[in-house]
Amino acid sequence: MEESQQQSTKFDAPPSPYVPSRVYLAQIYWKKPAIVVLRVLQFVFSLIAFSVMADLLHDVQGSIKSLSYTVAIGVLACAYALAQLSFSLWCVIRGATSSSGVTPLYQYATFICDQMSTYFLISAASATATLIDVSGVCGSNGSGTNLCSRSTASVTFAFLAFLAFSASSVLTGYYLVKCILKA
């Protein structure tokens, strides 16, 4: 009888391996609320920036082609921020454990995408800021006052979105370095 018990325990499943980097990465989203707040700010600022710029693009009837670039970058940044916000909230609600959470590959991808979004936003906002002044949309005769104020608001919100993305990029880079050093 004792021999049959030893045989049955001999084939039991081995205990699940402990992966410190996965456990650490899963704890980021529920122990560090700053990343969730930054994701909310990214989404809100990029949504306002691209919607105001899209309205401005509609009003100038596409005569300034590079405004389309700014709208496209704003849409991509807003979609990325919404996806990251959804995942962050999912981790917070679920209470991500060691078996279900983020992986180091996800952390690398997040860092790279945060960096790309940051640089695309700053390039689009700065190109639009100089283009608005050079193209004469904000004319000195006062004819483009409404267009000028909307373009200034859009560029301002794009710069605010840039700041939120850059702060998030710094945080994800910090967490990535800590993860690499722990592993």
From Swiss-Prot:
One of its GO terms (cellular component) is plasma membrane. Glycans are attached at residue 141. It is a multi-pass membrane protein. It is found in: Cell membrane. Keywords: Cell membrane, Glycoprotein, Membrane, Transmembrane, Transmembrane helix. Its main location: membrane. Belongs to the Casparian strip membrane proteins (CASP) family. This is CASP-like protein UU1. It comes from Selaginella moellendorffii (Spikemoss).
